Regions:
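Conserved acidic donor-binding segment of nucleotide-sugar-dependent glycosyltransferases
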Residues: 321-322, 326-333, 342-347
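A conserved mid-protein helix/loop that constitutes part of the nucleotide-sugar donor-binding site
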Residues: 14-22, 207, 211-236, 247-254, ...
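Aromatic "clamp/platform" in nucleotide-sugar-dependent glycosyltransferases that forms part
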Residues: 270, 289
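A short, active-site helix/loop in glycosyltransferases that binds the activated sugar's phosphate group
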Residues: 146-173, 180-184
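N-terminal strand-loop element at the rim of the active site
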Residues: 3-11, 15-70, 247
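A short, well-ordered alpha-helix in the C-terminal region of glycosyltransferases
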Residues: 195, 335, 342, 349-364, ...
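Nucleotide-sugar donor phosphate/pyrophosphate-binding loop at the beta->alpha transition
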Residues: 69-76, 111-117, 124-147, 160, ...
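Short hydrophobic beta-strand element within catalytic cores of glycosyltransferases
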Residues: 306-309, 319
Length: 393
């Protein structure tokens, strides 16, 4: 089979395709993984695939941005790869790879894969672009969906949103949640917390709010800072730790100074190993304008850290209101601050929410469950086409 992703940048899709490609080996699938190049300033997560022994074919012409120069070349390169591999299944991940990969399948002639699958790891059809661009993208997705055997959404909210805006009927979708090796990505060790607190000079009894991500407009980092300022005004002794880089980092650090909170803020930049930071945090804040399935929320809950987030995209499928975190509307600065204050003032509530979160996400987001679900779907689609099945494990 041929799997295509726009790029292996930091985030859930890169983890997903790496773990999935490796896991399906034991089920009799041979995967060729094609990945495009990172955008300027993005951090790579290709090391996950490398550590798993997954071979990646680099397609430098495949960029996240629309390019009248490079996009036709990327399509032609994928057509060539389809003709070389002759896959039974083409599976694309993320918007750009979905467009380029499925276009290539249409142009591959007699080598065209009989089964075409696309996974939406969220979508860019709300909150990312101006109305005209968004409408063009919607029409493109609708056209591509008519040539796709099955569409996958990483959560029911993502599926429902895509159905609502008319991308495809509900029966064309399957919901298959992410699978993550949480044991490898999250440390639940009190000694790590102590080490991190000593490293950054944070007293053990101080409430630490954490944020992890790429600093772009969709993540609404200004809301993180504004809600943290409000939290301090509520009388909470707190530190904010920002983990991540991106085009908005300088603006965020400037805003922290303008708000008068810079001495309470740790901005540590991109970190390849994030598990020690979950140990440092008491809670995670995630005020994004849009999310697919937020890996940072899953990892925080696995580390027994409650999450305060916005009620967007696939977030409600990860964070259960009042049980392992709190959900607010986008832009609700007071709501974010009040939820964080509630957690800061009640260590027992934090403990209960953290335990509930870990108990829920560990089984739900296992890699083995992901591989089982995708294997079952592939076998169903191959059977419908009358194609041979891989040997059962």
């Amino acid at each position: 089979m041929l799997r295509v992703i726009a790029r292996l940048n930091t985030g859930g899709p890169a983890l997903h395709v790496s773990y999935l490609s490796k896991g399906l080996e034991s089920r009799g699938y041979h995967t060729t993984l094609v990945a495009g190049r990172l955008a300027r300033g993005e951090d790579s997560m290709s090391f996950v695939a490398e550590e798993l022994g997954v071979e990646v074919i680099a397609l430098r012409e495949l960029h996240r941005e629309i390019s009248p120069v490079y996009d036709p070349v990327a399509v032609a390169r994928i057509v060539k790869e389809i003709r070389r591999v002759r896959p039974h299944i083409l599976h694309t991940h993320t918007a750009k790879a979905g467009a380029v990969g499925r276009a290539a399948a249409l142009l591959a002639g007699d080598a065209a894969p009989p089964v075409v699958v696309h996974t939406y790891h969220g979508h860019v059809l709300r909150g990312y672009f101006d109305p005209l661009t968004t409408q063009i993208f919607k029409e493109t997705e609708r056209a591509l969906a008519r040539h796709t055997t099955r569409l996958i959404a990483v959560g029911p909210e993502v599926r429902d949103d895509l159905v609502e805006i008319g991308i495809a009927p509900a029966e064309q979708f399957s919901v298959i949640r992410l699978g993550i090796d949480l044991d490898a990505r999250v440390l639940n060790d009190a000694s790590v917390r102590e080490q991190q607190r000593r490293l950054f000079g944070v007293p053990d009894d101080r409430f630490v709010v954490g944020w992890i991500g790429r600093m772009t407009a969709i993540k609404r980092v200004p809301d993180v800072l504004a809600s943290f300022k409000r939290l301090l005004e509520l009388g909470v002794d707190a530190t904010l730790c920002l983990v991540g880089d991106g085009p908005d980092r300088d603006d965020a650090e400037r805003q922290a100074k303008e708000l008068g909170i810079a001495r309470h803020v740790l901005s540590v930049g991109y970190q390849r190993e994030v598990s020690p930071y979950y140990a440092l945090f008491d809670a995670l804040v995630l005020p994004s304008a849009n999310e697919g399935t937020p890996v940072v929320a899953i990892e925080a809950l696995a580390a027994q850290r409650p999450v305060v987030a916005t009620r967007v995209g696939g977030v409600p499928d990860v964070v259960t209101e009042g049980e392992d975190g709190f959900l607010v509307e986008v832009g609700d600065i007071d709501g974010l601050a009040n939820a964080l204050a509630t957690l800061a003032r009640d260590p027992e509530l934090r403990r209960r929410m953290g335990e509930h979160g870990r108990e829920r996400v560990i089984p739900r987001y296992r890699v083995e469950r992901l591989v089982d679900d995708v294997d079952e779907l592939y076998r169903e689609l191959l059977s419908e086409k009358g194609l041979p099945l891989p040997p059962s494990s």
